[in-house]
Amino acid sequence: MKEIILATSNPGKIKELEQLLAPTICIPQADLGISDAEETGLSFIENAILKARHASSLANKPALADDSGLVVPSLNGEPGIYSARYAGIKANDEDNIQQLLSKMADLSQEQRQAYFFCAIALMRHAKDPTPLIATGVFHGLISVKPSGTNGFGYDPVFYLNEYQCTAAELPAKIKNRISHRAKALNQLRALLPD
């Protein structure tokens, strides 16, 4: 695919997707005047399909959507599909991180296990009855305080034992090789015809 609509307005996701999808030409939906789809699904996969179908129908082109978030099993899967608005509709990344750290304040290291989950949906056209779906998982733990300035979202509190740092302290080159989004996109590439 030479050109694809990115069904997101999240600048962090756009930057990562553009890097990971190169040399494909990526057009953020906002560049075409397309607003975000309402995320009414109950799972990451449902929301990715809703967003990709919305962008594809309005652009009349193939569209790719990523719905991803942080899952903390000891919090019954929170923040989950509500990761971007965990501390409220108008919350920013720092607000969401503080909400998470507050809820986890008394948890042991073992209870701080977490993972990022990414679902990617590719609609080849708006009425695509068989969208391509790929998923990726990125395991780590939630640190007790934020550290690092790279990345976005919960990266400053997502600690990676293997690298002895948070995802926000990793160089983009490494993160773009090991993250949930990178794993999902690699899976998607394997589904695409040559």
From Swiss-Prot:
GO annotation, cellular component aspect: cytosol
Active-site residue list: 67 (proton acceptor)
Cofactor: Mg(2+)
Manner of cofactor binding, per the entry note: Binds 1 Mg(2+) ion per subunit.
Keywords of the record: Hydrolase, Magnesium, Metal-binding, Nucleotide metabolism, Nucleotide-binding
Record bears the keyword Lipoprotein: no
Positions that bind Mg(2+): 38, 67
CDD domains, per database record: HAM1
Record's signal peptide: none
An example molecular function term from Gene Ontology annotations: metal ion binding
GO terms of biological process kind: nucleotide metabolic process; purine nucleoside triphosphate catabolic process
E.C. number: 3.6.1.66
Subunit structure as annotated in this protein's UniProt entry: Homodimer.
UniProt protein name: dITP/XTP pyrophosphatase
